[in-house]
Amino acid sequence: MGIRKYKPTTPGRRGSSVSDFVELTRSTPEKSLLVAKPKTGGRNNTGRITTRHIGGGHKQAYRIIDFKRYDKDGVPAKVAHIEYDPNRTARIALLHYADGEKRYIIAPDGVGQGTVVVSGPEADIKPGNNLPLRNIPVGTTVHAVELRPGGGAKMGRSAGASVQLVAREGKYATVRLPSGEMRMVDIRCRATIGEVGNAEQININWGKAGRNRWKGIRPTVRGVVMNPIDHPHGGGEGRTSGGRHPVSPWGKPEGRTRNKKKASSRLIVRRRKSGKKR
């Protein structure tokens, strides 16, 4: 993919950019793999906001992605199309299996129209093939990695993401995640060879707030600019710094770390590097 930059015809256009979408081969999705995606506005079944900063945005249909590929072991599939997916940053590939079934997978880098991919323990080590970590050479770059055998891909699914298999000992393999975290994963877990395509997506400049609204993202307002009724940091004459340790809108201390009592925490070899606190 490439990035197309706009000329500064308006303040919102100045500096903004968009993908050129040259890798896409079809503009309409496979209807049999679509399901409705109702808008929630961040509300739950009682109508209360459970997730802030969500609302509006363009209407979308959810594409059913095959994150497991277990039941297609040994069945070759040809990549029929590379398509756009509004629900994720990565592109998706439509597979036509030899038995006639059609499925979507996340499109790996280097996999295009006409490429043949296959899943299973005996698959070759080439981009797009899916096989257990026990059958993948150490040092290989993979993506769409499972956390538990049979649970479906959970890690390394966004545009440009790659996970490296750095070691294998006993019944566990050690992988390095895009965040820098290193963790152990059962060697029966599956991964797809190669890295996710559309890596240039991170360089897109959205240009104006409205483009985020098209994606269903509402503004994030700081507590210190609110009124006292709306946030513990609100109020005061003129600009204030808050006057207390950072808290959530409900008074809970902010900046908490991960739950150290989580069962899977023992599998984390090295934590991700955290950014500078501001």
Curated annotation (Swiss-Prot):
One of its GO terms (biological process) is cytoplasmic translation. SMART domains: Ribosomal_L2 (SM01383), Ribosomal_L2_C (SM01382). Residues 1-20, 225-278 are annotated as: Disordered. Keywords: Ribonucleoprotein, Ribosomal protein, RNA-binding, rRNA-binding. InterPro entries: NA-bd_OB-fold, Rib_uL2_dom2, Ribosomal_uL2, Ribosomal_uL2_bac/org-type, Ribosomal_uL2_C, Ribosomal_uL2_CS, Ribosomal_uL2_dom3, Ribosomal_uL2_RNA-bd_dom. SUPFAM superfamilies: Nucleic acid-binding proteins, Translation proteins SH3-like domain. Transmembrane segments: none annotated. GO terms for molecular function: rRNA binding; structural constituent of ribosome; transferase activity. GO terms for cellular component: large ribosomal subunit. Residues 258-278 have a biased composition (Basic residues). NCBIfam families: rplB_bact. One of the primary rRNA binding proteins. Required for association of the 30S and 50S subunits to form the 70S ribosome, for tRNA binding and peptide bond formation. It has been suggested to have peptidyltransferase activity; this is somewhat controversial. Makes several contacts with the 16S rRNA in the 70S ribosome. Belongs to the universal ribosomal protein uL2 family. Part of the 50S ribosomal subunit. Forms a bridge to the 30S subunit in the 70S ribosome. This is Large ribosomal subunit protein uL2. The gene is rplB.
